[in-house]
A protein has these predicted regions:
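Acidic/histidine-enriched alpha-helical segments
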Residues: 35-37, 50-68, 134-145, 251, ...
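Short, glycine/proline-biased beta-turn/loop segments that scaffold the active-site neighborhood
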Residues: 66, 231, 283-339, 415-435
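Active-site-adjacent helix/loop patches that line small-molecule binding or acyl-intermediate pockets
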Residues: 110, 311-316, 329-376, 381-408
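Soluble non-cytosolic domains of exported or imported proteins
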Residues: 9-16, 31-42, 53-57, 74-86, ...
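Non-catalytic, structured segments within soluble enzyme domains
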Residues: 1-190, 357-359, 369-373, 377-380, ...
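Second-shell loop/turn segments in exported
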Residues: 1-6, 25-35, 44-45, 49, ...
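A penicillin-recognizing enzyme superfamily signal
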Residues: 108, 112-115, 121, 152-159, ...
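Active-site SXXK
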Residues: 48, 118, 261-262, 282-313, ...
Length: 608
């Protein structure tokens, strides 16, 4: 593993290194803690000489050898640790401890190109976010005397060399400032004594962090930011230089799935898996804010409204025992816009229109029943007016599943990551059989009338019979008697909302991208993208979800302890750029692909 040799071929120094690892494999790891490993190697060699296993010349020769090792073995083709942990957990449930010893092979649904794009875009987005919040300061400051600075690096105190060998999250590097120069550069030192220059262009961003709402003044010199002895994080730039960096305190997630069958093609659940294994893509249940509004609008369409329906954007005052004594939702802008078409309200993310659609056009009970078809349940669906503003709790994976249903024309698909499992002899133990979108398998028109009357009584919802619930859920199933040959070996995804409903929601969300809160996505130069921003109360969560017919992708950014992200950190600024960067790479060279207009839709020009 460390020396790429058989045990019979290692020398005395290498043998002592391996023996030294045993008491504390992490502390004495020769790859990641070379200074510790070298010190421990010396102790083992001294004991070998003392006990007569080696003579003095052999001891001296072994001590003189440099500590050179690296990891050998199969190269990691794809960095997807959060998915790997999901797979490990599932394999343990299926096969127990044999998971580690029986030689299973697991094939996942990941697309390596998309996974790399997810890793890259989330890392860059979080690093950019933390720059905007200000510089937190060095990891620590180390007293560097003139004597230390003048010595060879191998003669530096072992404690300092150990600090340079500590793990750096997210692909950053640990460096030590050895000089702050008059030309506004800094001299830095890496593990092993490697030196480099840190230019002013990589330092000048570092306005001091004061609190979550305040930063200090812009630095004028490198000395305003750095001091000799500062232990810092740095990162390489595209110009071949180094830049000052810091580990983001905020976290994030990116999830992308194939709308045609639910295959998870990319997933990353945080900035760095080694320092935090909590998978925010799957395990973080956060308020989706306005990114939930497309589901409210879908419910409104189901109950007799159209994108041209005019709704009054005016104050709403609600008395509710489940909310505050009196609930007065407001628009983000604090203004009221009067009569507004549904399409324009979604484009401008008007909160009051969403509330009125839920309470006065659809009804909470009807909306909950409709939205549950997208895969939501429980905490995601509060039975009160806060539902209109995304006041429930959903994971990024939940949101991706819901957006995929809109993207694929109304079919319910379930996300999955394990495509196949093979045994030690290559035998197939499991192969996924996901429900797939099969438009040819579905009758063009549903065989029932859409409900148009609104029910408001929550108690009636609880007293409904199973037959009545089935009538309202209106899930259309394919009829195998029509074209039985289409159904051979096909697990067809059920149509849970009509193609017309899905198309209209897509179309309104496309306008969000073209001229609304998601217009930064127009930088991609595509015409097939639909999406929606989301920002929860006090800017504690920033979201963007978007799709075309090929991919549905959700981005979330927030703090694990639910503190606010800070002034100006809405979905359009914090999450959307990550989504744009991911989508640029994911759809590079892929032609525009959007759902065709289904029968039953009439396009009419509306005079604004």
């Amino acid at each position: 593993v460390y020396f790429n040799k058989d045990l019979a071929d290692i020398n005395e120094a290498e043998a002592a290194t391996l023996a030294g690892v045993l008491p504390a494999p992490s502390r004495y790891n020769p790859v990641y803690s070379a200074a510790n490993a070298e010190m421990r190697r010396g102790y083992v060699l001294a004991r070998m000489e003392e006990l007569g296993y080696i003579d003095e010349p052999t001891f001296a020769a072994a001590m003189a050898l440099p500590m050179e090792s690296r990891l050998y073995g199969a190269a990691v083709e794809l960095n997807a640790p959060f998915v790997a942990e999901m797979v490990r957990s599932e394999m343990l449930k299926r096969y127990g401890e044999g998971t580690y010893t029986d030689g299973f092979q697991v094939v996942t649904s990941l697309d390596s190109r998309l996974q790399k794009a997810a890793n890259y875009s989330l890392r860059n987005g979080l690093l950019e976010f933390t720059r905007r919040r200000g510089y937190y300061g060095p990891i620590r400051n180390i007293e560097l005397t003139d004597e230390i600075l003048a010595a060879e690096f191998t003669e530096w105190p072992i404690e300092i060399r150990e600090m340079l060998e500590q793990y750096a999250p997210g692909g950053l590097s640990v460096a030590l400032v050895t000089a702050v120069n008059d030309d506004n550069t800094a001299s830095i030192l890496f593990r092993g004594g490697v030196t480099a220059a840190l230019p002013w262009g990589g330092i000048k961003w570092a306005r001091p962090f004061i609190d979550r709402e305040t930063r200090g003044p812009e630095p004028e010199t490198a000395g305003d930011v750095l001091s000799v002895g500062d232990l810092i994080y740095v990162m390489p730039t595209t110009r071949g230089t180094w830049a000052l960096a810091q580990v983001p305190r905020a976290q994030g997630a990116v999830v992308s799935i194939d709308p045609s069958d639910g295959a998870v093609t990319a997933l990353t659940g945080g900035f760095d898996f080694t320092t935090s294994k909590f998978n925010r893509a799957r395990q973080a249940f956060r308020q989706p804010g306005s990114s939930f509004k497309p589901f409210i609008y879908s419910a409104a369409l189901e109950y007799g409204n159209t994108p041209a329906t005019v709704v009054l954007d005016a104050p709403v005052v609600i008395s509710s025992s489940e909310l505050e004594a009196v609930w007065r939702p407001i628009n983000y802008s604090g203004r009221f816009y009067g009569p507004t078409r549904m399409r324009e309200a979604l484009v401008r993310s008007m909160n009051l229109v969403s509330v009125r659609l839920l309470l006065f056009e659809t009804g909470v009970g009807n909306a909950v029943r409709h939205i549950s078809k997208f895969g939501f349940g429980g905490a995601a669906l509060p039975h009160n007016g806060s539902l209109a503003l995304g006041g429930g709790a959903a994971s990024p994976l939940d949101m991706a599943q819901g957006y995929a249903t809109i993207a694929n024309g109304g079919h319910a698909v379930k996300p999955y990551v394990i495509d196949a499992i093979y045994g030690p002899e290559g035998e197939t133990l499991y192969r996924a059989a996901p429900a797939v979108v099969c438009d040819e398998c579905i009758p063009a028109e549903p065989e029932f009338e859409f409900p148009t009357e609104t029910e408001f009584d929550g108690e009636e919802r609880e007293e409904m019979t199973l037959d009545e619930m089935a009538d309202i859920v209106n899930v259309y199933r394919p009829d195998a008697t029509v074209d039985p040959e289409l159904f051979a070996n096909v697990n067809v995804a059920p149509q849970v909302i009509s193609p017309q409903n899905a198309f209209l929601v897509q179309d309104m969300m496309r306008d969000v991208v073209k001229r609304g809160t998601g217009r930064r996505a127009m930088a991609l130069g595509r015409q097939d993208l639909s999406g929606k921003t989301g920002t929860s109360n006090d800017r504690r969560d920033a979201w963007f979800g978007g799709f075309n017919a090929d991919i549905a992708t959700i981005v979330w950014v927030g703090y694990d302890d639910d503190q606010p992200l800070g002034p100006g950190e809405e979905g359009s600024r914090t999450a959307l750029p990550i989504w744009v960067e991911f989508t640029r790479m994911a759809l590079n060279g892929v032609p525009n692909h959007q759902m065709p207009m289904p029968e039953g839709i009439v396009s009419v020009l509306i005079d604004r």
